[in-house]
Amino acid sequence: EISSGDLNRIPAESIESFSVLKDASATAIYGNRGANGVMLVKTKHGKENTKATVNVSVEASYFQPMNTPEFADGPTFMRTYNEAQQARSATVITPRYSDEIIAATESGINPYVYPNVDWYDMIFRSGNYNQRANVNVSGGASRVTYYMSLQANHDTGLLNAADNSAFNPNINHWEYNFQNNISYKLTNTTTVNLRMMAQIGSQKGPNNKTTDIYKKVMYANPVSFPAYF
């Protein structure tokens, strides 16, 4: 019996069949735990008196957001801010951003003094690549059957790494899964089964949640300070 999280870690290549038990058939076997239904997954096994068969699969995928927000540039932000500030006042007030500052920012004459930063483009990449590889072997003799599978997953994120920095804040997740089903027939009526699934992995990433990073980017001022000093 495994959880839904463990079920996600079973390689698709290792699944032979699955079925769903509902209603009385589920509760009769699993009691209250089967009240919402039970999924039975049967993993692959080797066959007697067959030669070893090796299967290898390699996948690469590219993920890209379908829609991304468009942010106002620095000059547009400053003009809009001045208009909103004036709209809230009954009298004429001195704008926060003068015409000289707006013009200097628009010209890009000195990005350190007059920054104009697209924080979304600075922090996030347009897409990310993920990889998955699986190798499994199965076979058997007159008394022994075996099936073994090894899978490696590599997932990355959308965070950019600065060209002038050795630190990479992006998500870097490696996961390795091993599974085996070994059966040994002691007698015509007795069989010993060894079934094992093991997992090991490593994950690196920012301390902040991705949603927090998105939120900070949404509220970031494009003209407050430059990205690099």
Tell where the protein language model's regions lie, with residue ranges.
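Membrane-proximal, glycine/serine-rich, low-complexity loop/turn segments characteristic
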Residues: 1, 7, 13, 19, ...
